[in-house]
A protein has these predicted regions:
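Conserved alpha/beta core of the MobA/IspD/sugar-nucleotide pyrophosphorylase nucleotidyltransferase superfamily
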Residues: 1, 5, 148, 153-191
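Nucleotide and nucleotide-moiety/phosphate-recognizing core
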Residues: 2-136, 144, 149, 166-175
Length: 191
């Protein structure tokens, strides 16, 4: 059974711009690199069977170390919510024959490679979610069994399945943080 990593990085980043940010939040500098470079590199370094980056609102640079390991998936419906990006990534994973995906966000540079690995290895239930000090976050592993339960549009993804079917979920304690960089203040706080 093969598993693909999916980094969702298609949104418009409107909250960052509204908070005074210049340009897209994913392209903001965080500890010497862009926010999205950290997220992609951490996912790719987990060495799952494939790594997909879903993009839409902006073109994204690839980190130098991940160029050979990453494939872009285009989501032209990114404005219809994060669920469309998840569906775009899952469609690609299904086409490529993967039986599960581990999904994370491009604006979460503090999610460590070890979190991607731990969640990917947790296969005793159809859904595995990273926890940080007992709080659920990203990434989330989704077996193909639950893909039909995911929404097609809107700003919710795996949370809907976890809320409706808690019996399918295993929590996985992970190092790091699942903090989003949504505003200029977030960027300053975590830098």
């Amino acid at each position: 059974m093969t598993t693909a990593a999916i980094v969702l990085a298609a949104g418009g980043g409107s909250r960052f711009i509204a908070s005074g940010g210049e340009g897209h939040k994913l392209l903001a500098t965080y500890l010497g690199r862009t926010v999205v470079e950290w997220a992609i590199e951490n996912a790719a370094a987990a060495h799952l069977d494939a790594t997909y980056v879903v993009r839409g609102a902006t073109d994204l640079p690839l980190p130098p170390l991940a160029v050979d390991a990453v494939q872009f998936v285009r989501n032209d419906r990114w404005a219809d919510g994060i669920a469309t990006s998840m569906q775009a990534g899952i469609t690609r994973a299904r086409r490529d024959g993967h039986a599960a995906v581990v999904v994370g966000l491009g604006d979460q540079p503090l999610v460590q490679t070890e979190a991607w690995r731990r969640v990917a290895r947790t296969t005793r239930s159809p859904v595995a979610v990273a926890t940080y000090e007992g709080v659920r976050g990203n990434p989330v592993r989704l077996s193909s069994m639950v893909w039909p339960l995911l929404p097609n549009t809107g700003d919710a993804g795996a949370r809907i399945v976890m809320r409706r079917r808690p019996d399918l979920v295993t929590e996985v304690p992970c190092p790091g943080r699942s903090a989003d960089i949504d505003t200029v203040d977030d960027l300053a706080e975590w830098s």
